Amino acid sequence: DRFLPSMQQIFVVVHLIGKILYSFVDALGNDESQRFYATKGKYYIAEGQRLFRDRQQAHLQSFYSKSAEIFPRICVNMQRFLDAMFILFEMRKNEDLQFTQNIDQTFVTKAKLYIDKHLVCNKRSNGDIISYVALETCHTTANLFDNYLFKNTLNLFNIDHSLNQTSIPSTQ
């Protein structure tokens, strides 16, 4: 697709961004992202506890409880993806990239330059590079997770539905 980066381009840029620690609290102490994901986590835990008290399906309890653990990880992965997309679109805007082009050493060199120039990161005294997970990223992730990933997971592992389904005999 000439309008979107290839999966290879995205993967390479994510790799080139390298080892970055992501924080939900920015350098100025803004913790809106952290408060947002903590609130989501509390909701998932409360739902899991409610299902436990109501003696509802154990797998649902487990999914809700696990959601509290994985949601911040998905936020971080979404931020990495958005950072990579930002770099790729900056390269394209400045005519240093066509989304149909192959990855070669020139692409890698230019991508590294764009990462250094455009990706806003803070460096700690111990050398760790820190980037901030934006509140908007948490909102986007919540929308994707709640309305797609979580619902599809529940549908895939719906025990009530699968118990009422008859097995289709093998034709082999």
Q: What label would you give each PLM region?
A:
Residues 1-172:
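Phosphate-handling catalytic cores of nucleic-acid transaction enzymes
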